[in-house]
């Protein structure tokens, strides 16, 4: 660990020295661009683009581009980036994370690397955590880019595909991380190439990068569809777990929050559901629902993890305190919470497409970020994203006072002390910002302040509409603001008139968060740009972090100090112990994210192959060669699977091949046993391929070219999409299933990789088979207009394929229906 830290420290010093030399070059060019007229300055953009086209690199033109952007910023918005902002911009350009304290001007810093990299005409994405910030920054900084002749857009959720495509084609795009990820998934579900909106992913600058790549790393983006009926099972599981007792029927690991049934709880489950063995393979769905019900009832808390609004369960973002409408806990946990809260259970849906931010952002050619707090997570950024954290010096020294924690025995005494401290500061007019980690604490303190007749603003997930306005006024004289976590992050708190003389903004933390980074973010709201400020955390031994990691040793320290319910103490020893506990939690969380990534990387490889195949079909105007090769591949697979270890096909196997080919691949002719018996394998393959392909070519020769092209493309995409959707769900179940392999001394991850690729290979074979069968069996309406086949895959299936079966051919009840529905014949046209 010490070696790793030394390596990081040495690298950071080396990089900063390099950046300072380049920054000096940028400042030396100041006079050159100051003297230019607006028209001359605006003409620099085309000159810089020409230098790139003539063979110079982005790094070659960097000093000039940065100097141009600085001068343009001054002329357009009246602000010229400081020297430290140029250092931050250099850190970003070279693919690092610039750690810049609150108020140091990250938004303006971003303009220089965004302008420089946009000159390549490959597009730059500036990523923010919400649409308010994306819109604000696009409008504010967009003035500078437009002055310099670049195009700028903001990517919003409600935009049409056409509007999104236009936005992505701009030089610089401001967007939320969620919208970028969802657009990527949607692009890989379209059935017409022109409906895709994204360009190749070139360069992303992520604002509040720790929030996006760390806090949200474990939350996958999911596009769902296709309802699965299981509401009753959730209700049954919920009723059962409500009969259980902690430690007797189930146990909770306080450190990891894992919850499991005891042997006694398992026996109760078997009696309750009247089954012999709860963990029998046939009851795997029931076990899953019981596990989710346990989590919902005993580890997920109303007003902390979620709120219930208008009969709906809405997620609360644990790191910002914001509501996340439209998002759902995955894997059935959302439905389990709905059962717990006795609200309508929304039908569980199948996952159509999914990706984590970890895998999405690693697809960019170059990735960088900026934040006020990333140093504590440097190892993770380095290992997973290959980014260093460069700590940028402040423009003015930080003079904020960070007091040692005040320790109390109980929450009750702690809250009384917080109210007393707020009252004392409020009486002299000093603004106070109170940070809480849960909505319930937020509302409790608000009610206590009301009783104390202290006027205040409250900001949490239930009251976020005025977020920016409330936070912006938090530095006014006499203001008191209570906010969950980092609500309002991205909005500066500027001090009102006369506040500096009162000591600046006072920040009070009501308890330590499990992440030091979140605590540092709260402290960082005070003391911006050399302003005075004060921060203080109040801690009790009833706080969650202390309960999870506190020890009797701490309590003995308190007893020795004579601490009782009426007193408090400041203890650097306990503060250090709290930070040690936080480091342990951070370590656990890092391990969990790394663990998730190891599993997601397996799916990532599958996704990469499938999306590449899908895009190849989409980008080809004519996929006839693809479908012919698919048919050939199926026939080769068929023959080789009937070949024994000596490379011989026995007569019995030849009979099976003949039966399969005649039943599934030929309509107007037959394969005879004599044509393949006692022949070489390659000759057998050739005979069958020639017969099948001849019949297919005969079938499509009368079709207009456009009809044939659209039909082949629609079927090819439909089969891939159906199987990919099933594969996602199969891999989810596999992941859940391998988790217990560790008890049998088998590495669950290795089992997941091995069995996952077996499933993937099987899926590719099935895609090959179904594509062939649908194309051979489907009868196409020859009077169909080409445009009717286009649209969604489902439309292509309904409009381009007649739901009729050729007379004279027997279709097995369990065979796939040749109409192209993807269902078995007995469940479709054979009803």
Model-derived segments and their meaning:
Residues 377, 478, 606, 720, ...:
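Generic detector of short, well-ordered, non-transmembrane alpha-helical segments enriched
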Residues 1-562, 611-612, 633:
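Conserved P-loop NTPase motor core
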Residues 307-314, 320-327, 529-530, 542-810, ...:
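Extended, charged helical/alpha-beta scaffold domains that provide interaction surfaces
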Residues 434, 482, 724, 760, ...:
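Hydrophobic, well-ordered secondary-structure elements that form the walls
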Residues 807-826, 830:
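Short Cys/His-rich zinc-binding micro-motifs
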């Amino acid at each position: 660990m010490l070696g790793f830290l030394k390596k990081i420290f040495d690298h950071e010093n080396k990089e900063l020295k390099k950046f300072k030399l380049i920054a000096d070059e940028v400042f030396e060019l100041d006079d050159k661009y100051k003297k230019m007229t607006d028209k001359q300055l605006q003409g620099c953009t085309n000159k810089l683009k020409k230098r790139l086209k003539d063979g110079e690199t982005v790094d070659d033109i960097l000093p000039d581009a940065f100097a141009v952007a600085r001068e343009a910023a001054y002329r357009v918005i009246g602000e010229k980036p400081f020297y430290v902002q140029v250092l931050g911009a250099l850190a970003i350009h070279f693919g690092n994370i610039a750690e810049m304290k609150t108020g140091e001007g990250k938004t303006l810093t971003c303009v220089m690397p965004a302008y420089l990299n946009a000159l390549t005409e490959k597009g730059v994405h500036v990523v923010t955590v919400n649409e308010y910030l994306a819109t604000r920054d696009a409008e504010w900084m967009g003035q500078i880019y437009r002055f310099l002749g670049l195009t700028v857009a903001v990517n919003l959720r409600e935009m049409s595909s056409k509007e999104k495509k236009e936005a992505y084609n701009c030089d610089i795009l401001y967007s939320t991380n969620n919208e970028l990820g969802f657009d990527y998934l949607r692009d890989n579900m379209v059935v017409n190439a022109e409906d895709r909106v994204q360009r190749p992913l070139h360069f992303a600058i992520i604002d509040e990068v720790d929030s996006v790549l760390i806090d949200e790393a474990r939350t996958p983006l999911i596009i769902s569809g296709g309802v699965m009926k299981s509401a009753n099972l959730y209700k049954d599981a919920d009723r059962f777990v409500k009969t259980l007792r902690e430690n007797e029927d189930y146990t909770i690991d306080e450190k990891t929050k894992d919850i499991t049934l005891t042997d006694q709880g398992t026996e109760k489950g078997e009696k309750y559901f009247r089954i012999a063995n709860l963990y029998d393979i046939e009851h795997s769905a029931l076990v899953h629902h019981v596990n989710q019900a346990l989590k919902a009832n005993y580890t997920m808390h109303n007003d902390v993890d979620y709120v219930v609004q208008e009969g709906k369960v809405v997620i609360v973002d644990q790191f910002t305190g914001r509501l996340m409408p439209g998002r759902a806990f995955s894997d059935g946990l959302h439905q389990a919470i709905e059962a717990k809260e006795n609200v309508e259970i929304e039908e569980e849906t199948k996952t159509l497409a999914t990706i984590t931010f970890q895998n999405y952002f690693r697809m960019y050619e170059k990735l960088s970020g900026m934040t006020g707090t990333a140093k504590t997570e440097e190892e993770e950024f380095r290992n997973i994203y290959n980014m260093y954290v460069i700590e940028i010096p402040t423009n003015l020294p930080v003079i904020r006072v960070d007091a040692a924690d005040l320790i109390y025995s109980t929450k009750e005494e702690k809250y009384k002390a917080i109210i007393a401290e707020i009252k004392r500061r409020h009486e002299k007019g000093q603004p106070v910002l109170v940070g809480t980690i849960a909505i319930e604490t937020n509302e409790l303190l608000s009610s206590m302040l009301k009783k104390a007749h202290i006027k205040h603003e409250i900001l949490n997930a239930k009251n976020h509409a005025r977020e920016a306005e409330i936070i912006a006024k938090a530095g006014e004289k006499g203001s008191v603001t209570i906010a969950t976590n980092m609500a309002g992050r991205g909005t500066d708190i500027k001090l009102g008139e006369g506040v500096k003389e009162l000591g600046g903004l006072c920040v009070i933390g009501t308890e330590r968060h499990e992440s030091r980074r979140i605590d540092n973010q709260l402290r960082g709201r005070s003391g911006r740009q050399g302003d005075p400020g004060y921060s203080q955390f109040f801690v009790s031994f009833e706080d969650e972090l202390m309960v999870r990691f506190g020890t009797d040793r701490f309590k003995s320290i308190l007893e020795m100090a004579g601490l009782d319910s009426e007193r408090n103490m400041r203890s650097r020893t306990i503060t250090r112990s709290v930070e040690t506990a936080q480091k342990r939690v951070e370590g656990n969380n890092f391990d969990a994210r790394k663990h998730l990534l190891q599993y997601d990387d397996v799916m990532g490889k599958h996704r990469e192959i499938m999306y590449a195949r899908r895009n190849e079909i989409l980008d080809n105007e004519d996929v006839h060669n693809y479908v012919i090769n698919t048919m050939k591949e199926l026939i080769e697979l068929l023959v080789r699977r009937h070949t024994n270890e000596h490379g011989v096909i026995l007569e019995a196997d030849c009979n099976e091949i003949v039966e399969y080919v005649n039943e599934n691949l030929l309509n107007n002719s037959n394969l005879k046993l004599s044509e393949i018996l006692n022949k070489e394998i390659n000759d057998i393959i050739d005979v069958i391929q020639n017969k099948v392909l001849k019949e297919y070519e005969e079938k499509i020769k009368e079709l207009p070219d456009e009809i044939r092209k659209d039909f082949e493309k629609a079927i090819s995409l439909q089969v891939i999409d159906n199987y990919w959707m099933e594969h996602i769900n199969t891999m989810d179940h596999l992941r859940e299933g391998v988790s217990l392999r560790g008890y049998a001394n088998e590495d669950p991850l290795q089992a997941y990789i091995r069995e996952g690729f077996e499933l993937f290979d099987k899926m590719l074979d099935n895609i090959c088979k179904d594509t062939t069968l649908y194309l051979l069996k489907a009868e196409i309406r020859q009077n169909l207009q080409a445009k009717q086949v286009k649209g969604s895959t489902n439309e292509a299936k309904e409009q381009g394929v007649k739901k009729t079966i050729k007379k004279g051919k027997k279709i097995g009840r369990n065979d796939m229906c040749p109409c192209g529905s993807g269902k078995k014949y007995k469940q479709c046209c054979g009803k």
